[in-house]
Amino acid sequence: MTGPELVDWDLAVATGRRLVRPGPQLTRAEADEVVAELRKLAVEAEAHVVAYTHLQPQGEAPPVVVVDRKEWLRSNVAGLRSVTGPLLGKLGDRSSSGALSRSIGRRITGLQIGGALAFLAGKVLGQFEIFLPPEEVAGPGGRLSLVAPNIAEVERKIGADPRDFRLWVCLHEQTHRVQFHAVPWLRGHLESEVGAFVDATDLDPSALAARLKSAVSALRSRDG
């Protein structure tokens, strides 16, 4: 890619961090308890998944982290930037827009992405992040993130037993982590599929922007 990126990723992070809703009201002791138990239950859940599936993890295990909404948002911008980089680079090279239009467009797209991820940051309970760039996580294995404020908020809202609900979330997310940890070629396969899509795509920048706007509108229409 010879020119500026088609998305202002820094603006996406800044916008998302400004728009993301605060988490539930917790004392410091309550917050520490949630984080500590999620870390403990993540280990327990991995053992359950391995015992049930008979999948045998290989090599260094992807890390498990407990994060807040803003950190989830920031890491997802990094992952989105990594996985869409080749496609956006291809589209950027073929773009006929002038420098001013391109500068405005990349900022608008950054605002849209930040707004969409700010909404999702208050909803996601956990996520196995496959495509994080090397500077975000050591090794190529991805990372499991558990979003503590969202888990605490939902368990309160539905009146669930905290330990049971947290274990359920950990079991769900550890299933993905164990799958990728036990099948080392799976991540490379997904990367090759993404690469094949990039090579085959004939989408122009304006069409991509239109699709992004539609996706953001769909996300917002689900709020509430």
Place the predicted regions along the sequence by residue:
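Auxiliary, metal-adjacent structural segments of Zn-dependent hydrolase domains
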Residues: L41-P149
